[in-house]
Amino acid sequence: MEESEQVLPLLTNPKDLTNPSYASSSSSSSEPRDETEDLLLPISDENEEEEEENSPIRQVALTVPTTDDPSLPVLTFRMWVLGTLSCILLSFLNQFFWYRTEPLTISAISAQIAVVPLGRLMAAKITDRVFFQGSKWQFTLNPGPFNVKEHVLITIFANAGAGSVYAIHVVTVVKAFYMKNITFFVSFIVIVTTQVLGFGWAGIFRKYLVEPAAMWWPANLVQVSLFRALHEKEERTKGGLTRTQFFVIAFVCSFAYYVFPGYLFQIMTSLSWVCWFFPSSVMAQQIGSGLHGLGVGAIGLDWSTISSYLGSPLASPWFATANVGVGFVLVIYVLVPICYWLDVYKAKTFPIFSSSLFSSQGSKYNITSIIDSNFHLDLPAYERQGPLYLCTFFAISYGVGFAALSATIMHVALFHGREIWEQSKESFKEKKLDVHARLMQRYKQVPEWWFWCILVTNVGATIFACEYYNDQLQLPWWGVLLACTVAIIFTLPIGIITAITNQAPGLNIITEYIIGYIYPGYPVANMCFKVYGYISMQQAITFLQDFKLGHYMKIPPRTMFMAQIVGTLISCFVYLTTAWWLMETIPNICDSVTNSVWTCPSDKVFYDASVIWGLIGPRRIFGDLGLYKSVNWFFLVGAIAPILVWLASRMFPRQEWIKLINMPVLISATSSMPPATAVNYTTWVLAGFLSGFVVFRYRPNLWQRYNYVLSGALDAGLAFMGVLLYMCLGLENVSLDWWGNELDGCPLASCPTAPGIIVEGCPLYT
């Protein structure tokens, strides 16, 4: 059995599969373009004579087209216009909603759908006149019908604006939480360098994470399915629906339905029925609360509850979903209850689930009192106030992060070490390619030196900024080089896990741990080290995922590279400008005491982490001076767990299910908590089971036609209705005050149960 087959559950003989054909609606009328010819390379006769092999991954074989039309124009006027507008609009809206108590993320799928009628309108109305005809500068604003390759590049622009720019956390925490100074220029340098640094790592690891068929990036299949539904002409089967018809129906239903959980009946976000039966029991509400407790029996009837933190369960392969589910059960339903009811780390003094920082008496820790005028830890003030405490779940979540780190390294070494070594050797000689890689050979690749130039220039600019503006950033030059070292070590193993399972173990904890031990008492330095070590790696994985999308849709790599660079730079500027405007114009933004809708929940978690790892330092919390030193044993647990699975797979080679146990995914299952909550997981796993196991196994034809299309329709309907509700009602603060909008209905879930601890609204235990 090949190495890739040891971890992939759904491999099959390619000859048993149907190969979906590619038929763009515009391919028949488009003429070859000079821009495309410049990106083409001849395909050897030897490759043309090879037997066509589809992808060994069944989901890819059923979803991705195996043909290409290189004559389709790509870098068109409408691509630049619609791509730039999509990037700007999504960047603004996502950052605008990011600071709100209930943040709304507008995915690239929204733009992916919205630009279709606009692109076709531009194709119908804009002149097709050829300017400077006969010269090397000739161009036209309208090269023909709106085609799928233009559409893919527009979506790449939209992807740049579809998520948050992580380095914005640094700016927000410094300005809104610590109330210190950081200039716009310095903020822009930090944001751009962290985003662009990922291109360097992406270039280094392309041959390992894009070209191999085993690195299939499940999330991309949602977009591939949507592109095909929007562009291919499909015959309607008797009694059935085309994918386009199905998408429209599902989109309308999702759009109309979200008015209930999004506005009229918000309790649908988390139906914690255990709390309804025990309205006066703290223990019952701790167990049953989907938002503030363990979420036993809790379920959400809201697509945003399902997909907001873990992504679409319809895009996750079942074995990965099962690993997440098992990891969630072990942590939330086994480890946390045992530690809480045994009062480990004074657990009963604090809520069972919280990201807040506490004093020994259960009150919120006064952070500002332990910071001196130089933005460093005031040690005498810290000793007067006493040590910082975490709720037991928060402490365990850090331990789980430690275990996930060592498990990732060990898992990749054991299950993919030979594969990585063989790939390294194959990069210097001819290798057998699948159909998608062979089709991409006709296009000129991005030269390695492009990536190296970006990497070296970016690292140099980062070192200069950190040294010249050290009073604002606090990070010394050696910290930048150390962060880059951490990123380059972990990009490949975490990239492999993500490319196979659609789940990414987090690296943020180890970056915080390293710099916190080496350079304690400097919170901004800790945050900067984290974004250069962690986010540059995350950006690399995002760029690699986009490269794989281009690989599936046969986009010229140099064109894809250009779109990624331009989209990233535009999104950085728009994100920062929007965040700066909000922080300058909204009084007390991120202040939860004011009952404002602008409470910045994710930035609060980032701020708490900067206090734990940067200001106070891991030595005083997890080291020899701390209360939680035993949490470090999780490193050993994480290293041992993959070895046990590997040994079991060798001892029982016929037990295929053993090879599907992915310890990095299983151990890091709860890494999104907080801000994710239990109900996000329970509902996500249920939806993933129905899609990835039940439908895929018993109705494979139905799954093939509609699964990924349904995922895109649910995302899009939610996003459009979410924006509409906010623009029409949210801006005017029009709300409904009734029991159906009381989220969760578990007011006692956050109460402590230790004797003598007084918290407003909670019963006093004696």
Swiss-Prot record:
Gene Ontology biological-process annotations: protein transport
Record's GO cellular component terms: membrane
Stretches that traverse the bilayer: 79-99, 104-124, 154-174, 184-204, 247-267, 287-307, 324-344, 390-410, 446-466, 477-497, 509-529, 561-581, 627-647, 676-696, 709-729
Keyword Thylakoid: no
One GO MF term attached to the UniProt entry: oligopeptide transmembrane transporter activity
Compositional bias annotation for Acidic residues: 45-54
Location(s), subcellular: Membrane
Region annotation (Disordered) ranges: 1-58
Tissues of expression: Expressed in the major and the first-order veins and in the hydathodes of the leaves. In the roots, expressed in circular zones surrounding lateral root primordia and in some part of the root epidermis. Expressed also in the sepals and the cortical tissues of the stem, but not in the conducting bundles, the petals or the reproductive tissues.
Protein function: Involved in the translocation of tetra- and pentapeptides across the cellular membrane in an energy-dependent manner. May also transport cadmium complexes.
Family classification: Belongs to the oligopeptide OPT transporter (TC 2.A.67.1) family.
Name by which UniProt lists this protein: Oligopeptide transporter 7
Originating species: Arabidopsis thaliana (Mouse-ear cress)
